[in-house]
Amino acid sequence: MAKMWAGRTDGITEKIADDFNSSIHFDSRMYRQDIEGSMAHAAMLAARGIITQSDADQLIDGLSQILQDLDNGTLTIDLQCEDIHMFVEQVLTERLGDVGKKLHTARSRNDQVALDIRMYLRGESDEIAALIRQLITAVTDKAEEYRDAILPGYTHLQRAQPITFGHHLMAYAMMLLRDVERLADCRRRMNRSPIGCCALAGTTYDVDRNFEAQRLGFDGLCLNSLDGVSDRDFCVELMSALSILMMHLSRFSEEIILWSSWEFKFVELSDAYTTGSSIMPQKKNPDMAELVRGKTGRVYGDLMALLTTLKGLPLAYNKDMQEDKESVFDACDTVKMCLKVFTGMIETLKANRANMKLAAQKGFINATDLADYLVKKGMPFRTAYKISGQLVAQCIQENTVLEELPLEKYLAHSDLFDNDLYEAIDLMNCVEKRISQGGTSVASVEEQIRLVREALQA
């Protein structure tokens, strides 16, 4: 069958070429944006006197009916069409005759698809941001529940200083909050209308680009027609933001995987978010966390695929750009699923306070506080640091811990030690003394929770 774009050629192509060229299998998900954009375009054409109001009314009514039919399932997308734009125009022309052929006046598929994908990704950005907010709420609620649960803090995966589980969780809440901010910033740049840029050079018709932009909820226009149809940096930026988000989820997943192991036993995952083994009946595998960690690489791959596609393209539109959609659609779909699963996993997670505290009692994570004790009594920090290290070495040799080392052995290193040192190196006291803004004390964590909840309400 001849194509709507048949002009210089007869429009008849081999089936294998049709299949290779077609994008309707994946761009059909943008049917709503395509139809809404066309309705705004028809209204603008009439407002500028390019077509009659009667024709515009027929076009808008016809498009509205197509949208309704697609929504309720009485119309099925024909996957033999080249793309969603051609499908909608074909159905419209079949129903309206020559009036349907007027819709594409002062428009190209180049600006049409750029419009559709901006509108579609605008919605995806909003949905993903809402899902991140739900996850932040789950993390923050869990942090409040465990704001006083002692946990060993790590550097280099070695026990470092005592913190609380609530403090650790709030670190991820802060990261996720920045992910929401990145999406909002990305959306702001994305929300510029390319319609009216036409194929690449603009149009000879007296169009009103602002009319369509305002009607479709855009904040402004793409101010150069070549740029409007030929760049996909807004896709790249969105996928970059999603990659950073997935990096945060992957790090969180890695810790959950470690914490849920028998070697740590810091957390217990709900049976609803774990799986078993086909051969080992004792297993309870953190598959959801592992899949999130694994799917992070998939989203990274989507980003790199699009960057690689775009890097060598001359202006303006090239068919290579059809490859933008599968990558960005896959990234959005993957991220949404990961966020939904992750939120449920966090909501049902239970922490083992006893095991976390037991782990914190090993590894001399109060050694810094021991040094600070001497500093507050007038000793230079580097001297105090050295003495604290010597005492740790002595404890290791004697198979004991700082809290149980007798006072006389402390006095052998410095006469500044007194009985009050045991209070200074008590783990909960070590936590509660860290009152600096953003610190791990219960009061500080509660303030972090308050600030995040306040930000979520903004």
Where are these regions (language model features)?
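A helix-coil-helix interface module used to build multimeric assemblies
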Residues: 1-202, 207-211, 275-276, 287, ...
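Glycine-rich cofactor/substrate-binding loops
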Residues: 1-37, 98-99, 280-458
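Short runs of predominantly hydrophobic/aromatic residues within well-ordered alpha helices
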Residues: 38, 85, 89, 235-238, ...
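Generic, well-ordered alpha-helical scaffold segments in large soluble proteins
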Residues: 41, 62, 66-69, 91, ...
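Short, well-ordered beta-strand elements within core beta-sheets of diverse protein domains
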Residues: 41-51, 120, 167, 236-244, ...
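A generic structural-conservation signal
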Residues: 54-55, 152, 222, 383, ...
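Charged, flexible cofactor/metal-binding loops and thiol motifs
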Residues: 117, 122, 129, 144, ...
